[in-house]
Amino acid sequence: MLYYAKIVREKGDLRNLLNAAIDITAMVYDGEDDVPTILDKSEKRIMEAASHQNTSDFTPIGDIVLSTIDKINTVYEAHGGLTGIPTDFTDLDNLTSGLQPSDLILVAARPSMGKTAFTLNIAANVAIRAKKTVAFFSLEMSKNQLMQRMLCSEASLDSQKARVGELTNEEWNRLIGMGEIIGKAPIYIDDTAGIQINELRSKARRLKSQHGLDLIIIDYLQLMQGSNTKNSGDNRQAEIAEISRSLKALARELNVPIIALSQLSRSVENRQVKKPMLSDLRESGSLEQDADIVMFLYREDYYDPQTTNQNITEVIIAKHRNGPVDTVKLYFKKEYTRFDNLSKMQ
């Protein structure tokens, strides 16, 4: 019986692959899309066939009820614990219950607020301490620059001293020791400048297939290109909207959280109150619409050096589709470009 069941299953797989091949051939002959788009759609179609997926299928509501109750029961059994991936920032995790699968999380701030440092800290915490696989797409910094930042941050080393070669022997030992730890962590870095959304999506799919994937981080969204590079300069808002929608769709397809860094418009600098608002998101209202969570980073000491709130960064949760909005505070160690729980510093 098992032998015949195996034959039936294999025939079904072959039929799925044949249908995928027919669809791909039709796309090539139609000529409606450019080559990168056809490659992206072809890869997705083959992966669907290989994993027995069919995106057009309806699901009986009874099945949805059962899976939803199972999810609620999992939360109940956690007794208030985290249901997502921990960032290791306690107050933030308590607010979000961790990074949730299929969520698109936007982290936005003006320059010099620590966006890259914040997400590098999250990447290290998730990969080293939670043992989860992280894909980091760095469009602004090279992989070596990014790794130097992570090494100094995790080893509590002054990044400026590392840049100018003034580390002591003891600091060198700490750097090497941390290098051994980070070198074993499941972090994968891609530093393709101006990467297209199709290419990013393809790389993320392959990484998930080959090594597993739990979290994607993109630094930063406005440096990405849409799928149609020929007309990318015509309407930047429409291009950002396409990228935003595609990232949300990718988060759902791979069932992983995606953290995308974003710039804020200069209008923040032109008003008396500098704290960011949702209307400050640069280039497209679709960013606010597509994101499940919007976080703003704000440091009062950046604008007011005399403030008593030195080294305090506010993480403002301005949108939270499935939870409360609030503000949590972290301690920012500038010399290490590292964030820590505020309670740890008190």
Segments and roles (model prediction):
Residues 213-260:
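Helical hairpin unit composed of two closely spaced alpha helices linked by a short loop
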